[in-house]
Structures are given as structure tokens and as C-alpha cells.
Amino acid sequence: MDSSHIAVRVARRSPSPAAVSQSSYGSLGSSQDIHIRVDKEGVASESTPLLAAAQRSIKTSSSLTASVSASSTTPSNCRRNPTLHEDCFNWRSVGLLVMCASALALAAYLLWRQTQTPDFGYRLSIVGHGIWSDMELQGRGTLFDPIGVGTVIFTHTGSNECHDDCPDVLHKLERSHVGELPYNFLVAGDCQVFEAQGWHYRSQYPRDLNGIDSLVMAFVGNFSGRPPIDCQLMAAQALILESLKRRILQPIYQLFVLGSYTDALQRELRHWPHYASHQTSK
């Protein structure tokens, strides 16, 4: 049995001289003078000070052991530690913001690719009229038929070609014309497309194709003897596809080559889809 559960009490039955004399030598007299009481609850009394001190030391050591054990088994996670909880919350917020920003950037990139890149993988670069032109448009003119444009007309400017200084060449073209340039788009030798009247307004090019609305696209240069360079032709094809994507051009359209001294251009474009004929302007 555990010593903490035993309480010992000593009492003297009679104050006999023999008992007193024997107790001076460390003896308690006879065995009848010793009373042992076993307390199941092990409650200490004033007659057992040593046992009370032992019990207090045992309880103290037990409480220390329990506290050390609890502290050692406490998980180091964000829920038990307020500081770590705040740090983890901050990191989760940063991670969520990064994910949202990445998703928005990806969506913007995919949208840009859809509007700028045709199906055959060639990038279409369009320079707006307000960016390259020194002149303000004097009225946008007549809007296209909302049903869609049924004709694409290709021609050339008959001017110098350009590769690096295309805005300068186009400025000279603007100054040589009375009013606006009579085209919707100009396809330059630097592989860029420059907006004139754009996708929504009729150009001032002579319309002698039964009055059908036409997208007029002019190659910058003179192509009576040789066709435009490859990147110009690819940019023109991309411009047609982009017009179809925007539903400006009808799916069943016709392609014409118009203008004087455009024989080389006609020989190149007659192999394109929807090619109809080559006509000289009146």
C-alpha cells in the first residue's frame, strides 16, 4: 500500500514512570501504546506533519509534470497560437490575392489573343487612326450595313513602300489627298495594319460593285511588277479573319482586286478564297 495512504498516530495510555523512562531512550513502551489507523482517503492531520509535507510535495510535482506535459504536447499550429494564427491568416490572404491576380492576368491574355491572333497563328497588329495620323477625321461618314459587309476590295496606294518609316510615308499620303484617305485599312511593309476609316464606316473609294458595302484594304506601295512581301500578305489575311470574327464581314463574301497597275497583286490574290475578279477602276 502507498505510504501516502497510511496515517500513524501515537498515544500514551498512561503516564507511567516506566513509560516515561523508556521513552527517553527512543522506545514507546509496549506494543499496545501504538495505534495505527489506515485512512482510505489519505487525509493528513495535525498529528502527521511529515505525511502532510510529503503529500504536498507529491501534489506539487504532479501538477508540474502535468503542466510540462500539456505544454510539450500542445501542437504548434495557427489555431493554438494567436501570433501564428495571425501570420497564417496574412499568408492565406496574400496567396488568395496572388491567385486572383494570376487568374485575371490569364483571362486578359486569352482575351487579347482571341482578338489579336487569327486562327492560323499569325499576330495581327493594328495601329489606330488617332495614334499614327496627324489629321483629325472630318466626320466618320456613313455607317456600314448592320447586316454585314459582303465585299473585300484590295488595291495599292501607288506610293513608295515602307518598312521602318511607315508613319512618315502615310503622312505624305494624307497630305497628297483632298479629304480622308479612301481606305478602311492600309497594310504596310512593317507588317502592321494602319486604320483609316476602320471597320464601321464606308470608305471614299469608288464603289462600282452594285452598291455593295465593301471593306477597302490598300497595300502601301506600288505592286504593278511584283506582289507585296510575305508579311504584308499574311497581315491582310489576318485582317480578313479578324473582320469575320467581329462579324463585320459576311461569311459568304467576295474578294476583288481594283485599281490601275495592280497586275502583280492580282496574280497573287487570285489564289485566295472567295476571289471573284480583277477590275480596273474607272
Swiss-Prot record:
The cross-references to InterPro entries, in alphabetical order and at most eight, read:
Amidase/PGRP_sf, Amidase_domain, PGRP, PGRP_domain_met/bac
Which cysteine residues pair off into disulfide bonds?
Answer: C162-C166
Residues assigned to the Extracellular compartment are: 112-282
**Keywords in alphabetical order:** Cell membrane, Disulfide bond, Glycoprotein, Immunity, Innate immunity, Membrane, Transmembrane, Transmembrane helix
Task: Tell me the residue ranges located in the Cytoplasmic compartment per UniProt.
Answer: 1-88
**What tissue specificity does the UniProt entry give?**
Expressed in uninduced hemocytes and mbn-2 cells.
Where does it reside?
Answer: Cell membrane
What Gene Ontology terms for biological process does this UniProt record contain?
Answer: innate immune response
Chief subcellular site? membrane
Which family, according to the similarity comment? Belongs to the N-acetylmuramoyl-L-alanine amidase 2 family.
What protein name is recorded for this chain?
Answer: Peptidoglycan-recognition protein LD
The major lineage groups are: Eukaryota, Metazoa, Ecdysozoa, Arthropoda, Hexapoda
What gene makes this protein?
PGRP-LD
